[in-house]
């Protein structure tokens, strides 16, 4: 005999929310689904280019490979100088 009450609740009209707007409804085990990208704003379907920056990874890449602005290069030099000072103080101990 199967166990009773082990299945999750089913919401046949679950709302899919993207950027604060309800974009579609679907069936799900959660009443609301929050998404960053859906077919209505995905670059493949819209034909536009959009950079999806997750946790500053694009900025870090730009700084690392010198594709950023002059301010980013100056910030990188400051960070390198701080790291060198930390290395020098740890070697003296």
From Swiss-Prot:
GO terms for biological process: translation. GO terms for molecular function: rRNA binding; structural constituent of ribosome. Gene3D superfamilies: Ribosomal protein L31. InterPro entries: Ribosomal_bL28/bL31-like_sf, Ribosomal_bL31, Ribosomal_bL31_A, Ribosomal_bL31_sf. SUPFAM superfamilies: L28p-like. GO terms for cellular component: ribonucleoprotein complex; ribosome. The keyword RNA-binding applies. Residues 74-93 have a biased composition (Basic and acidic residues). Residues 68-93 are annotated as: Disordered. Keywords: Ribonucleoprotein, Ribosomal protein, RNA-binding, rRNA-binding. Pfam families: Ribosomal_L31. The keyword Transport does not apply. Belongs to the bacterial ribosomal protein bL31 family. Type A subfamily. Binds the 23S rRNA. Part of the 50S ribosomal subunit. This is Large ribosomal subunit protein bL31. It comes from Prochlorococcus marinus (strain MIT 9303). The lineage of its organism: Bacteria, Bacillati, Cyanobacteriota, Cyanophyceae, Synechococcales.
């Amino acid at each position: 005999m199967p166990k009773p009450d082990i299945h999750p609740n089913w919401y046949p009209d679950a709302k899919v929310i993207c950027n604060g707007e309800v974009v579609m409804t679907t069936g799900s085990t959660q009443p609301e689904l929050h998404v960053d990208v859906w077919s209505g704003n995905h670059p493949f379907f819209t034909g536009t280019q959009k950079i999806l920056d997750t946790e500053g990874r694009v900025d870090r890449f730009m700084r690392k490979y010198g594709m950023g602005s002059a301010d980013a290069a100056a910030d990188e030099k400051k960070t390198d100088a701080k790291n060198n000072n930390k290395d020098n103080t740890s070697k003296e101990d």
